[in-house]
């Protein structure tokens, strides 16, 4: 219990710092009304039976998260698979408190424990992955909750912007709020979430997820985005100079059981 209180206060302090710097953006949206996103990346071991991990997601983890109040869990694979395979899991929580509460509840959830039995009995010499990475994000003030797209075949683009300092990332987040959201929508680049990363690697950074019907629509969307007059105004504003030092992106496909 003491550990949980420490984690909650520590992460809340980190989130509070982000909120304090971003409150000027669009009108004092408190952190309590913005979702917390956990993003996990699993890299499978060579030759591992990935169906065992997927069965765990389908029959144990996702149903348990749903029971405890998480409305939609996203599970994705790479658009163009690599070897070893990778899986990506997006869990949107209503708050940091919900994230910590569910972490504790899963330890005593008998249905989850039963449904996880096969997964948990995998021997060490048949481990599915070495480790998974995890990051926590606080939703942007101007996009405080996840937008779940229609359940149809589509491509997702995960984009990460790293900054050379906290101020650089804060200024980039302000740039989103000062005009980028409607440009994305006009261009047909459909946002799923925007997150200010408050715990994880490669900090400081922000991450967001877009979706389109296919790669052709994605390419047309970005062409429209960079040609938009409002975008040209934004990039000409000196306050947004040197906000990004590195951009990385990944193309993802939802699994058949993904809820996002």
Name each model-derived stretch:
Residues 19-33, 62-88, 94, 178-207, ...:
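Short, glycine- and small/hydrophobic-rich beta-strand elements in well-ordered beta-sheets
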Residues 43-53, 59-68, 72-147, 165-167, ...:
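Hydrophobic, ordered structural segments
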Residues 34-45:
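Acidic/histidine-rich, surface-exposed loop or edge segments in extracytoplasmic proteins
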Residues 139-215:
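Surface-exposed interaction/gating patches
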Residues 39-41, 88-92, 158-160, 207-209:
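Conserved hydrophobic/aromatic beta-strand scaffold that supports enzyme active sites
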Residues 252-259:
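Short, low-complexity, Pro/Ser/Thr/Gly-rich segments in the mature regions of secreted, periplasmic
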Residues 7, 100-104, 160, 173, ...:
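Non-transmembrane alpha-helical segments in soluble domains
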Residues 4-25:
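N-terminal export signals
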């Amino acid at each position: 219990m003491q550990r949980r209180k420490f984690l909650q206060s520590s992460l809340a302090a980190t989130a509070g710092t982000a909120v304090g710097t971003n409150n000027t953006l669009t009108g004092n949206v408190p952190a309590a009304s913005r979702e917390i996103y956990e993003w996990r990346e699993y890299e499978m071991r060579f030759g591992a039976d990935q169906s065992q991990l997927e069965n765990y997601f389908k029959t144990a983890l996702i149903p348990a998260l749903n029971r405890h109040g998480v409305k939609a869990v996203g599970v994705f694979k790479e658009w163009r698979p690599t070897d070893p395979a990778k899986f990506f899991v997006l869990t949107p929580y209503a708050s940091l408190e919900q994230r910590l509460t569910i972490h504790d509840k899963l330890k005593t959830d008998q249905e989850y424990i039963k449904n996880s039995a096969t997964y948990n009995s995998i021997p060490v010499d048949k481990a599915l992955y070495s480790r998974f990475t995890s990051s926590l994000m606080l939703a942007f003030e101007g996009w405080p909750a996840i937008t779940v797209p229609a359940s149809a075949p589509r491509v997702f683009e995960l984009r990460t912007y790293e900054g050379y300092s906290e101020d650089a990332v804060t200024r980039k987040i302000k740039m989103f709020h000062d005009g980028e959201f409607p440009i994305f929508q006009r261009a047909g680049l459909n946002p799923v979430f925007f997150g200010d990363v408050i715990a994880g690697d490669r900090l400081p950074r922000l991450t967001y997820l877009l979706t389109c019907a296919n790669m052709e629509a994605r390419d047309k969307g970005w062409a429209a985005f960079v040609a938009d007059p409002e975008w040209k105004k934004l990039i000409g504003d000196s306050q947004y100079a040197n906000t990004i030092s590195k951009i990385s992106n990944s193309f993802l496909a939802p699994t058949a059981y993904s809820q996002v």
